């Protein structure tokens, strides 16, 4: 069974056993279980159901495999002939999760 979920400001279509990289869940450790209640749609074929905007009672549970930081993104700004240069870096905090079950 597939489900479309919304978590950490992003939408994903997942099935059981999928591994995703999402924005980090606050105050969680690796090995913790997260329940995602914002399920937008579930099913395949004739069993497909769409929520308005979410399905009541549908829950997707996921296990956090690890918390890590993403690749460094360099933001460089320059204005020609003005002598202005600015270089900043950013690394996004990420969580790697594995979808364990989809309950409708």
Curated annotation (Swiss-Prot):
Q: What is the source species?
A: Opitutus terrae (strain DSM 11246 / JCM 15787 / PB90-1)
UniProt cross-references to PANTHER family, sorted A to Z: 50S RIBOSOMAL PROTEIN L21, LARGE RIBOSOMAL SUBUNIT PROTEIN BL21M
| NCBIfam families in the cross-refs | L21
Q: What protein am I looking at? A: Large ribosomal subunit protein bL21
Family per similarity comment: Belongs to the bacterial ribosomal protein bL21 family.
Instruction: Name the source's superkingdom.
Output: Bacteria
Name one molecular function that GO assigns to this entry: structural constituent of ribosome
Q: Which Pfam families match?
A: Ribosomal_L21p
Subunit organization: Part of the 50S ribosomal subunit. Contacts protein L20.
Q: Which cellular components does GO assign to this protein? A: cytoplasm; ribonucleoprotein complex; ribosome
What the entry lists under SUPFAM superfamilies is as follows:
L21p-like (SSF141091)
One GO biological process term: translation
Annotated keywords: Ribonucleoprotein, Ribosomal protein, RNA-binding, rRNA-binding
Give a short account of what the protein does.
Answer: This protein binds to 23S rRNA in the presence of protein L20.
Tell me the gene name. rplU
Question: Which InterPro entries does the record associate with it?
Answer: bL21-like, bL21-like_sf, Ribosomal_bL21, Ribosomal_bL21_CS
């Amino acid at each position: 069974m597939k489900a479309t979920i919304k978590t950490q400001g992003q939408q994903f279509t997942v099935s059981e056993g999928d591994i995703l990289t999402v924005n980090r869940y606050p105050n969680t450790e690796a090995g913790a279980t997260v329940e995602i209640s914002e399920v937008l749609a579930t099913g395949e074929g004739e069993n497909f159901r769409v929520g308005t905007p979410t399905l009541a009672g549908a829950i997707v549970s996921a296990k956090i495999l690890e918390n890590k930081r993403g690749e460094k993104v360099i933001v460089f700004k320059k204005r020609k002939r003005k002598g202005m240069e600015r270089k900043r870096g950013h690394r996004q905090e990420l969580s790697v999760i594995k979808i364990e079950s989809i309950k409708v």
